[in-house]
Curated annotation (Swiss-Prot):
The keyword Lyase does not apply. One of the primary rRNA binding proteins. Required for association of the 30S and 50S subunits to form the 70S ribosome, for tRNA binding and peptide bond formation. It has been suggested to have peptidyltransferase activity; this is somewhat controversial. Makes several contacts with the 16S rRNA in the 70S ribosome. Coiled coil: none annotated. This is Large ribosomal subunit protein uL2. GO terms for molecular function: rRNA binding; structural constituent of ribosome. It comes from the Archaea. InterPro entries: NA-bd_OB-fold, Rib_uL2_dom2, Ribosomal_uL2, Ribosomal_uL2_arc_euk, Ribosomal_uL2_C, Ribosomal_uL2_dom3, Ribosomal_uL2_RNA-bd_dom, Translation_prot_SH3-like_sf. Keywords: Ribonucleoprotein, Ribosomal protein, RNA-binding, rRNA-binding. It comes from Caldivirga maquilingensis (strain ATCC 700844 / DSM 13496 / JCM 10307 / IC-167). Belongs to the universal ribosomal protein uL2 family. The gene is rpl2.
């Protein structure tokens, strides 16, 4: 009896295929401020720069003057002990958090909120940033790292600067063990085995005395879906002789 292939098992979403988010220190997001706090400048200090399992960029642990704590994606140029400002009147410096409507046009920002108060959704991966393009009445046009333009509420918060850890993908893994540990933090399955290298019960392309290329079209597909040789007993010049012999045999039997 056959088995479900790996892709089908992953599609079900069992525990083996879920990203182990419980290993992370905390979610990287802005804390919720009251309406009064949003109008003033709140200061905080970076206590430490930490690595969060499963994330591409380092994180900074920020403690506010009112005692609240949060973890945010670290930006280039910050350091332990740096004072971080939150508010519309904050200085335009790396690490400070401001409403995107108060940030000058052309400024590079990261951890941009999609909706006001959601904690940050855009430009959070290592080395990424968005660019403030145009301010309008109540919205701001932002260019994302992909080049796509989006319009967000001018009250949405963003961090000044570029997310730290740029150039991460330029460093080679070198060893398969490094790639294994990388995949384990994301619940990826590594190494990835080819279907035709498996046994027949494990994959439709598996089995046989030697590896053969599979086909994406099943044998019982309708005629319009099959083009070329699908399920043919033989092909080539030898097949012509074989069919001629079969035709002669049928004629003798009919005679």
């Amino acid at each position: 009896m056959g088995k479900k292939i790996l892709v089908q098992r992953a599609g079900r979403g069992g525990s083996q295929f879920r990203s182990p988010s419980w290993r992370r220190i905390a979610p990287l997001r802005y804390v919720q401020f009251s309406e009064e706090q949003l109008k003033t400048t709140i200061r905080g200090i970076i206590k430490e720069l930490v690595h969060v399992t499963g994330l591409n960029a380092p994180a900074m642990h920020v403690v506010l003057e009112n005692g609240e704590e949060m973890y945010l994606p670290a930006v280039e140029g910050v350091y332990v002990g740096k004072i971080i400002e939150f508010g519309p009147d904050a200085k335009v410096e790396p690490g400070n958090v401001m409403p995107i409507g108060k940030i000058p046009e052309g400024t590079m920002v990261c951890n941009i909120e999609k909706r006001v108060g959601d904690g940050g959704k855009y430009a959070r991966s290592s080395g990424t940033y968005g660019v403030v393009m145009i301010h309008r009445d109540s919205t701001t046009l932002v260019q994302l790292p992909s080049g796509r333009m989006i319009e967000v509420d001018s009250r949405a918060r963003a961090t000044i600067g570029i997310v730290a850890g740029g150039g991460r993908i330029e460093k080679p893994f070198v060893k398969a063990g490094n790639k294994y540990h990388r995949a384990r933090t994301k619940a990826w399955k590594y190494p990835k085995v080819r279907g035709k290298a498996m046994s027949a019960y494990a994959h439709p392309h598996g089995g046989g005395s030697h590896q053969q290329g599979g086909t994406p079209v099943k044998k019982n597909a309708p005629p319009g879906q099959k083009v070329g040789f699908y399920g043919s007993k033989c092909t080539g010049r030898g097949c012509v002789r074989w069919r001629a012999q079969q035709a002669k045999t049928q004629q003798r039997q009919q005679a």
